[in-house]
A protein has these predicted regions:
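A residue-level marker of the well-folded mature domains of exported/periplasmic proteins
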Residues: 13, 22-343
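Sec-dependent N-terminal signal peptides of Gram-positive bacterial secreted proteins and lipoproteins
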Residues: 2-23
């Protein structure tokens, strides 16, 4: 299994995701893929046995925020591996961008109309996704992954405590700068649950350490828009910004590119996700750090929880996926840990 995980991740980093073959028609979306393969006798991990396989070829739909990013590619890979291990069909799809809320709602409704056996959603906007999922409550397992939503009767949430994880980065920067330091935050979608939780964790830990947060702006979760946002911040606060705390690694990369284009190399930039692209920049001295989630495990565990629920097993209402701060001190060890999966 470890070798397979490594190969899957390497493929994600090398090429953009392509739709996999399916034993049934794929959902009507250009950003959809499905996996349906025989159950594997190999355990999901060394510490956790594979749950009992489904008695038939169940179909689990996973609607992510998008498939057009490195991070969500890792989540999809985890879902695909779970499909292999449990011998089920898993449809993975998502809108063209995380800002496409109405497109995601339509995808959720489409999957429910196909009479799937369970559905897992990473909501672009929590209330919109919850509204689309409400008719499924009590009929099939309904789970959230990465980003939670308020929905009475939902089965479970699988993901990182975003506020607590972001606080790791905020405290690190506060300790580095010392009291009186100045920072800015580049958040994701304004008002979106994950973005607000991470922003809260950043700001509270920075302010507790005596750091002034000069401003917070949205980078829309992408490198190019975050680059433009950082350009604006640099123009408004010349020679003041000492650190930037970002919603995700794409945001951090955009901020770093803006700094580089302006000949600035002394601003500490923190990302969030633990993507290899960001860790490589940490080792190159261009990023200060990233808060590593475990997106592959997150996708795997979400499908695993859905299978358990279909099988009638009791699952926890919250299934946590731990995060850790990656800096230059442990970046190589983090990459070595990934590489060791192939052994």
């Amino acid at each position: 299994m470890k070798k397979l995980i490594s190969l899957v991740l390497a493929g994600i980093l090398a090429i953009s995701l392509a739709a996999c073959g399916s034993s049934q028609p794929a959902p009507a979306s250009s950003s959809a893929a499905s996996s349906s393969v025989p159950a594997s006798s190999e355990p999901a991990s060394s510490s956790q046995p594979v749950p009992k396989p489904a008695e038939k070829d169940y179909t689990v739909s996973v609607v992510l925020k998008t498939l057009s990013s490195e991070y969500w590619g890792y989540v999809k890979a985890g879902c695909d591996k779970a499909a292999q291990d449990f011998g089920i069909t898993v449809n993975v799809l998502g809108p063209a961008a995380e800002s496409e809320i109405s497109e995601q709602v339509a995808q959720i409704e489409q999957q429910l109309s196909a009479n799937v056996d369970a559905i897992v959603v990473a909501p672009c906007e929590s209330s919109a996704a919850a509204g689309a999922l409400a008719p499924a409550i009590g009929k099939i397992p309904v789970l959230f992954v990465d980003t939670d939503a308020e929905l009475e009767g939902k089965t479970s949430f699988v993901g990182t405590g975003n506020k607590e994880a972001a606080a790791l980065g905020g405290k690190y920067i506060a300790d580095k700068l010392g009291k009186g330091g100045k920072a800015v935050c580049i958040c994701g979608q304004l008002g979106e649950a994950t973005s607000e939780s991470r922003l809260s964790g950043y700001k509270e830990s920075l302010e507790a350490g005596g750091i002034t947060v000069l401003d917070t702006l949205s980078g829309q979760n992408t490198a190019d828009k975050s680059m433009a946002t950082m350009e604006d911040l640099l123009a408004r606060f010349p020679n003041e910004i000492q650190a930037v705390l970002c919603h995700n690694d794409d945001t951090a990369i955009g901020a770093q590119q803006a700094c580089e284009q302006n000949g600035i190399d002394n601003i500490k930039i923190i990302g969030f996700d633990g993507n290899k692209s960001a860790v490589d920049l940490i080792l190159a001295g261009k990023l200060e750090g990233t808060i590593a989630q475990q997106p592959f495990q997150m996708g795997y565990m979400a499908v695993e929880a859905a299978v358990k629920s279909i099988n009638g097993e009791k699952i926890d209402p919250v299934i946590p996926v731990p995060a850790k701060l990656i800096t230059k001190d442990n970046a190589q060890a983090y990459l070595d840990e990934l590489a060791s999966m192939s052994k």
